[in-house]
Amino acid sequence: MSFRARLLAAERLNDSLLCVGLDPEPSKFPAPWTGDATRIFDFCARIVDATKDLVIAFKPQIAYFAAHRAEDQLERLMAYLRRVAPDVPVILDAKRGDIGSTAEQYAREAFERYQADAVTLSPFMGFDSVEPYLRWPGKGAILLCRTSNPGGSDLQNQRLADVDGTPRLYEHLAQLAQGPWNTNGQLGLVVGATFPEELARVRALAPTLPLLIPGVGAQGGDAAATVKAAWRGDKATTSAPIIVNSSRAVLYAGRDAEFASAARQVALATRAALNAAR
């Protein structure tokens, strides 16, 4: 089953647009795990157990594991996700952006070593940096487009004088991803909830692409505004889901032994807010 099909199935199964980001910071773990990087898997597994029936996807961020020499725990977590939440797709948040044989190895890392359903990529080096991932049938490649950070405007909002219509960079990227780059229907886009007008513009330019939308929760993005900008209930205009990510607001909702229960309550509330805005 393709990444797109798995997303649509998970959306229906769990009645959800919510993605929980797995960004483990040992310094924020509850006692007695506080500061203990050997407990990264245990912490993430508890979050998964508490939220797996509430989400459209999970999104582990590879840097939070690599910084603590915990790639083995990430492998263990990915295997755990496949076992306890087999119907929930997993997006490896890696934001890779190289070309050629290096990109081939990054694709192998994402799809063979970690067996992710999709991976995030930086397309700054052009289609050469995307194409190696499209050789993996059924896997998703989600390209940074209009990101949630304020500094994203430094490049993404600049107009391209040499392109017809002088679109902004993020607009041109959305058009490429919707059109000539999407050779096998595997692409999606990352667009931040913190810029709802740009989010609506990307959805208009890329009506069939899945959108991974960070920025709801700790970054201040509004759930209702996000859904209004990106969701299209009319199947004639789009068959692509939106994947609204929340990481810190869910992971660190509680700082004591009941942290998983607190995470579930925040996930429930966020899912409800997103669904109410459809």
UniProtKB/Swiss-Prot annotation:
Q: Which UniProt keywords apply?
A: Decarboxylase, Lyase, Pyrimidine biosynthesis
Main EC class the enzyme belongs to: lyase
**Family matches, as InterPro entries:** Aldolase_TIM, OMPdecase_AS, OMPdecase_type-2, OMPdeCOase_dom, RibuloseP-bd_barrel
Please list the residues that make up the active site: K95
Task: Name its species.
Answer: Methylibium petroleiphilum (strain ATCC BAA-1232 / LMG 22953 / PM1)
Q: What is this protein called?
A: Orotidine 5'-phosphate decarboxylase
Family note: Belongs to the OMP decarboxylase family. Type 2 subfamily.
Q: SUPFAM superfamilies from the xrefs?
A: Ribulose-phoshate binding barrel
Give the EC number(s) listed in the UniProt record: 4.1.1.23
HAMAP family noted in UniProt: OMPdecase_type2
Report the leader peptide range.
none
Q: Molecular function terms in GO for this entry? A: orotidine-5'-phosphate decarboxylase activity
Catalytic reactions of this protein: orotidine 5'-phosphate + H(+) = UMP + CO2
A GO BP term here is: 'de novo' pyrimidine nucleobase biosynthetic process
- What does the record give as its pathway? Pyrimidine metabolism; UMP biosynthesis via de novo pathway; UMP from orotate: step 2/2
